[in-house]
Amino acid sequence: LRETDVPKLVFSDFSTIDGDGVRTGGSYAASAGLRIPQDGDFFPKLLAQPYVFGCACGINRRLLELSLDLPDGIEMYDCWIALTAALLGKVEYLPEQTIQHRFHSSNATGRAGQNSFLMRLKRVSRGFGTQRENTALRLRQVTLLRRQYAELLPPETDAMLAALERAQHGGPAAVSALKKRGVGRGGAMQ
């Protein structure tokens, strides 16, 4: 994180505890079925499946400076910051569990209450549109990233983002464009 000119994010796995501090599981990444790339190609997988949690990451000053002006419409701040690092700098994953994260009924995100009757009813009532809506939301992140960092993007990165932007309006073409960019079964949009 000490590199000053390159935006950098380091994140780790974590274990979970409940509202009373009782350990509820081992690796969160394993229990949640997260597919975190080991090859360093974080952007396409982050776009498909947000797997960076702010509670288990650190950023350097350069990434902080880039991230202070969060645009309206971002999906989650921690994922936005991770996408920024993946596009403009470096992302590093530590597979060890560096913290214990508390999940409780008041969490804004996470799995607490996901199996309650109300949550199951909400999921059923949303029906099949959920996957399409999530894909559209994640593709909108591409437009926001491209606008936010237009002057900083290398030409090849801008071309990749432009292709993904076009995919927003393409139905099956969107799937094809995503697969060409490395977003497929290993990081299927969910």
Which stretches of residues belong to each language-model region?
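Phenylalanine-focused residue identity feature
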Residues: 11-14, 28, 42-43, 53, ...
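C-terminal subregions of glycosyltransferases and related glycan-biosynthesis enzymes
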Residues: 46-48, 74-75, 100-190
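Short, intrinsically disordered low-complexity segments
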Residues: 22, 60-61, 180, 184
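Conserved donor NDP-sugar-binding/catalytic core segment of glycosyltransferases
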Residues: 1-25
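Secondary-structure boundary motif
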Residues: 2-3, 69, 147, 151
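Proteins with a high burden of low-complexity, intrinsically disordered sequence enriched in S/T/G/P/A and R
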Residues: 1-8, 56, 182-190
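Conserved nucleotide-sugar donor-binding catalytic segment
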Residues: 34-114
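Acceptor/aglycone-binding surface of glycosyltransferases and processive sugar-polymer synthases
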Residues: 18-35, 48-49
